């Protein structure tokens, strides 16, 4: 296999050396941190937080075979961006931007 070929059996690796599972984990890390502030929590986030797959808490990409974590981040990127912008959290904004650009 050449250095330019993609191995299909590697979860979350669509481009060489891009770890989309970890990128999604970092976004969720930031989301949970921002939501610790009660002024940022609302009914929407109360519904989203329980949807975080077990693989996130285990930090195990192999247990997230359906890529649920990445799907959760990418399908909610607009709302995550709004949350992070409202909180004026540059670290979270940058993490989301990286995940969107590399993985979504």
Curated annotation (Swiss-Prot):
**Keywords carried by this UniProt record:** Nitrogen fixation
Membrane-spanning ranges = none
**Could you confirm whether the keyword Glycosyltransferase appears in this record?**
no
Q: InterPro entries given for it?
A: CowN (IPR024899)
Q: Which family is annotated?
A: Belongs to the CowN family.
What does this protein do, in the record's words? Answer: Is required to sustain N(2)-dependent growth in the presence of low levels of carbon monoxide (CO). Probably acts by protecting the N(2) fixation ability of the nitrogenase complex, which is inactivated in the presence of CO.
Q: What is this protein called?
A: N(2)-fixation sustaining protein CowN
Origin species, per record, is: Arcobacter nitrofigilis (strain ATCC 33309 / DSM 7299 / CCUG 15893 / LMG 7604 / NCTC 12251 / CI) (Campylobacter nitrofigilis)
Q: Which gene encodes it?
A: cowN
């Amino acid at each position: 296999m050449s250095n330019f070929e993609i191995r299909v059996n590697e979860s979350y690796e669509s481009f060489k050396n891009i770890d989309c599972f970890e990128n999604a984990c970092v976004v969720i890390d930031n989301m949970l941190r921002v939501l610790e502030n009660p002024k940022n929590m609302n009914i929407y986030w109360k519904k989203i937080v329980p949807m975080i797959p077990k693989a996130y808490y285990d930090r195990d990409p192999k247990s997230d075979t359906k890529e649920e974590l990445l799907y959760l981040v990418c399908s909610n990127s607009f709302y995550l961006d709004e949350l992070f912008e409202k909180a004026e959290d540059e670290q979270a904004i940058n993490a989301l931007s990286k995940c969107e650009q590399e993985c979504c």
